[in-house]
Design a protein with these regions (language model features):
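Residue-level detector of Asp-centered blade-edge/turn motifs that repeat once per structural unit
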Residues: 45-48, 89-93, 135-138, 175-179, ...
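Short alpha-helical segment of the dimerization/phosphotransfer core of two-component systems
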Residues: 869-877
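Primarily the dimerization/phosphotransfer
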Residues: 808-853, 883
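Conserved small/polar residues in nucleotide/adenosyl-binding loops
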Residues: 914
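A conserved beta-strand-to-alpha-helix junction within the catalytic ATP-binding
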Residues: 895-910
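Helix-loop junction within the histidine kinase core
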Residues: 885-896
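Conserved beta-propeller blade signature
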Residues: 50-52, 94-96, 141-142, 181-183, ...
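Residue-level "micro-hotspots" composed of small/polar
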Residues: 19-47, 51, 73-85, 122-127, ...
Length: 914
């Protein structure tokens, strides 16, 4: 007992306390990220899941991956007329927007703004600066203004009433926990109390002194389970005592946080207090303040002046700042407690790079950094700097720690070993000296390890040595060579001492038999260790040895075959700094890409945690980890260290709604032009169908799952029916592009998950219609059908005409043939008749020739001459008739001769003379 008291006194002397709690870490959303202005006055999450932010330059609708800004548009009467937005509320799915010159209503169905033109019975408009809009349980809207007092609007009856009797300057409105009262903070009269229908009940004054008549301006009011808390100026937080009707003041002049601007319930016993000078936690039981942010920490608040705070549906905190935009803290961020000596001391470079951890008998942690030694009290969570030897200026770059009884062995870079007696505070030094034998191998001490026999081994950048307590010196172990850098040492359950080197693989030394083995990487042999640069050695709860390497990833050792087995070649990073195993058997592995959680047996449930989850950074330090006696894991990196309880991790169970939020065309990026082209009178996330012309058949569909814890890790699965044959899954990209789609009707379906892969199985659907060109339109096809029918009729007419013509031609041929047949029969008959005539003429000619041979005179000779002439003439005619037949048959050959026409006439005449 006496020794413990002495130790506490010594620690109190050498320890310099820095902090008693981890600070909040935030993700920022600012102008550089798409926010319209870094001064954010108000925020709400609507029924769809979107976050609406009111700023000094416009209204923002944020979905985690993108932001749409509503501002005043010149000559557009449906745009927001005033860009200075200070109050927001959702009413009947529409957004009521309070500005510094009146009230506007955003109609979601038409995507338009309209001025709230309702008047009181006296014709008064809401035209002043609006500070707050609150909807009470009975459906009334309470509108706080600066200059016109308090307005109450009933949406059912559309009646607007004004109350400016008690005060004209109202800052905040809050409904009581029992829903029967409404508290109103005013500039002149302090806190006012109304019933739920707007009837004034009483007022309360707030001051720093109960005997003072001065009243502070109340900036904010919050009712927590019946306790009414007030935030005012001059470091004042007040609580209304409803029994006495007075306000109890809790001032913190030592903190100097200025005015309290915003209040929010944090836990059952704690309030979040947003001030002019940072964020504080107020314990309602102990009535104490605790700083929740650190101005020296770049991951803390981006601005110390807080305008407001809000919880979203996932339980994440949104902090609205005056000049730093939005600061977001998710539940995932709260999984990891974060500490940094640099941020705690406010001195840049003061121990921000954290190295080894060492737990003492009381469960507290010693921490080595590049700038000295620190002590972490696990009960009070107080981190303190320990001045070795009581000298503040003495700073060591500490690479290893090992507790041996009351002595803490400290391995440093370039300065050897320091052994700190925790009981007396004395320091003993061990350094390397060339001229003195049996000193440590090198002053660059990388690891110190004590085996089961109690022997202490020291790994340095120039080999391995063993401590000899009897001679108080060191003996170099030559079995591994002096040119080898030893980074880690571990003794397994089989009494094998594993020595990890940075340039020669790993050695194993059996402490019972004294037998050495050397394992190195060989390119041609996959059963060898994956890299010769081994950073850390770890034995799991089943006795399996694991090795984390620099560039070779993680591998395990099979003692039966003496083969090394690579764990998983698909690890995001091949540099393994440290390995710890939790109570459930899962591995937690630090790397250059954050911390991995892996099940070593099933290799399932792989998780990667990064700076976005609250880690000190993505890069950690070699062998900087510890599993404490209470099961907490400690990991150190280049910006401090994290502490967490793995068993308390709870995945994000929020099922996010999924919406299609935007359509981008290949040649048109202007949102307003796209909106006109689509001819949508409402936001696209409310549309179930869009129509595109054939010229716009290449487009990109943007969609989003409204989970804000880590939007970049939300996953999506989508499909365009008619184009995609199967679902495109496991994509973190929240857009899908399609090119040169033929005209037709398609159906786009998308599903989404949050960052912890909690999927929304409900499919969001959008029909996409691509209209054809005019020559492929319905009217064009109607014309084409008419033309086709006309062409068919014309073809039929032409065919009928051709058939008729052909029939007529056949009939004509038949008629001609028939006529020719009749003609031939007539000609035949005529020829026969001619033959009948010719035969007698021939018979007449023969006796006539005989008679002419006898000489006759006188008339007989003349008569015979006439008879002969006519007979010859008749024979000539018959011959000509026969020649006509030949001519008809084409067998006649004309024999043309010249003759005297006069003779022919005389002959004819002479024939007719008688």
């Amino acid at each position: 007992m006496k020794l413990t008291k002495i130790l506490i006194l010594l620690l109190a002397f050498w320890l310099e306390p820095l902090s008693a709690s981890p600070y909040f870490s935030f993700k920022k959303y600012q102008v550089e990220d798409g926010l319209s202005h870094n001064t954010v006055w108000c925020a709400i999450q609507d029924s769809y899941g979107f976050i609406w932010l009111g700023t000094s330059d416009g209204l923002n609708r944020y979905d985690g991956r993108g932001n749409k800004v509503y501002r005043n548009v010149l000559n557009d009467k449906f745009s927001l007329e005033n860009n200075f937005v200070e109050a927001l509320i959702e009413e009947d799915q529409n957004i009521w927007v309070g500005t510094n010159s009146g009230l506007y209503i955003y109609d979601r169905a038409t995507d338009r703004f309209s001025y709230f033109d309702k008047t009181t019975q006296y014709g008064v408009y809401v035209s002043s600066e609006i500070k707050k809009i609150v909807k009470t349980e009975n459906g009334l809207l309470w509108i706080a203004t600066l200059g016109q007092g308090l307005f109450i609007y009933d949406p059912k009856t559309e009646v607007l009433t004004q109350n400016s009797i008690q005060t004209s300057f109202v800052w905040d409105v809050c409904q009581s926990y029992d829903k029967k009262k409404v508290y109103v903070s005013s500039l002149q009269e302090g806190l006012l109390c109304f019933d739920e229908n707007g009837k004034f009940l009483q007022s309360y004054r707030v001051s720093s002194d109960v005997n003072s008549s001065d009243s502070y301006k109340i900036n904010c009011v919050l009712d927590v389970e019946g306790e009414v808390w007030l935030g005012a100026g001059n470091n004042l937080l007040g609580r209304l005592n409803r029994q006495t009707g007075t306000v109890e003041n809790y001032m913190a002049p030592s903190l100097n946080f200025g005015a309290v601007r915003s209040l929010l319930k944090y836990t059952e016993n704690e309030l979040l207090v947003g001030t002019d000078n940072g964020l504080y936690l107020f314990n309602r039981e102990s009535k104490t303040f605790l700083r929740a942010d650190n101005p020296a920490d770049p991951r803390s608040l981006s601005d110390q002046t807080i305008n407001g705070m809000m919880w979203d549906a996932e339980g994440a905190l949104w902090v609205l700042t005056n000049l730093g935009g939005i600061n977001y803290m998710s539940k995932q961020t709260k999984r990891f407690d974060y500490y940094s000596p640099a941020y705690l001391s406010g001195i840049a470079g003061a121990g921000e790079v954290v190295g080894p951890f060492c737990e003492n008998k009381d469960g507290n942690i010693w921490i080595g950094t590049q700038s000295g030694l620190y002590f972490f009290n696990t009960v009070t969570r107080e981190l303190s700097e320990y001045h070795i030897g009581g000298v503040k200026s003495q700073k060591y770059d500490i690479r290893s720690l090992m507790l041996d009884g009351d002595c803490l062995w400290i391995g440093t870079y370039a300065e050897g070993i320091r052994v700190l007696n925790l009981r007396t505070g004395s320091i003993k030094e061990y350094t390397h000296s060339r001229g003195i034998p049996n000193t440590i191998c090198s002053n660059d001490v990388l690891c110190i390890y004590k085996d089961r026999k109690g022997e202490i081994f020291v790994g340095t950048s120039w080999g391995l040595c063993r401590y000899n307590p009897d001679a108080d010196n060191f003996m170099t172990i030559t079995s591994i060579g002096s040119m080898i850098s030893v980074g880690d040492i571990y003794e397994d359950m089989y009494n094998n001492l594993w020595i990890a080197t940075t340039n020669s693989g790993v050695f194993s030394y059996n402490t019972l038999s004294g037998h050495w083995k050397h394992f190195q990487h060989e390119r041609e042999d996959s059963t060898t260790i994956t890299s010769n640069s081994v950073i850390t050695v770890f034995e799991d709860n089943k006795g399996v040895m694991w090795f984390g390497t620099n560039g070779g990833g993680l591998c395990s050792f099979d003692p039966k075959t003496e083969a090394f087995i690579e764990f998983d070649s698909a690890l995001p990073n091949k540099v393994i700094y440290s390995i710890e195993q939790d109570q459930t058997g899962d591995f937690w592995i630090s790397s250059n890409a954050g911390i991995f959680k892996i099940n070593p047996i099933s290799k399932a449930h792989f998780r990667q945690f990064t700076i976005n989850d609250g880690l000190q950074g993505n890069q950690f330090m070699a062998r900087s980890s510890l599993k404490s006696s209470e099961g907490k894991l400690y990991f150190g990196g280049i910006n401090g260290f994290n502490v967490f309880q793995p068993e308390r991790f709870v995945d994000n169970s929020y099922i996010p709604p999924v919406y299609v939020t935007d359509i981008r065309l290949s040649y048109l990026n202007d949102e307003q032009e796209v909106k006109k082209l689509l001819q949508l009178g409402k936001p696209i996330y409310m549309a179930d169908k869009i129509t595109l012309s054939y010229e716009n058949n290449s487009f990109t569909i943007r969609f989003v799952a409204l989970s804000y814890e880590d939007p970049a890790r939300n996953r999506y699965s989508y499909m365009l029916k008619g184009v995609d044959k199967e679902w495109i899954t496991n994509s973190e990209n929240n857009s899908a592009s399609y090119t040169n789609l033929p005209p037709g009707e398609y159906e786009f379906e998308v599903r989404g998950s949050n960052n912890d892969h909690q999927w929304n199985e409900k499919t969001t659907t959008l029909r996409v219609v691509i209209t054809p060109p005019w020559w492929r339109s319905s009217f064009a096809y109607f014309i084409y059908i008419l033309l086709l029918m006309g062409w068919i009729v014309w073809i039929a007419w032409r065919w009928n005409l051709r058939v008729k013509h052909k029939y007529k031609h056949r009939m004509e041929k038949y008629q001609i043939a028939k006529e020719q047949e009749v003609y031939k029969s007539k000609i035949g008959f005529f020829i026969n008749l001619v033959h009948e005539i010719r035969t007698p003429l021939s018979l007449i000619r023969l006796p006539l020739e005989k008679l002419q041979e006898i000489e006759h005179e006188g008339k007989e000779a003349k008569y015979l001459s006439v008879i002969d002439k006519n007979v010859n003439y008749l024979l000539g005619i018959t011959n000509q008739l026969l020649d006509f037949q030949k001519m008809e048959n084409g067998a006649l050959q004309l024999n043309l001769v010249s003759c005297d026409i006069k003779e022919i006439v005389n002959d004819v005449y002479s024939c007719l003379l008688y």
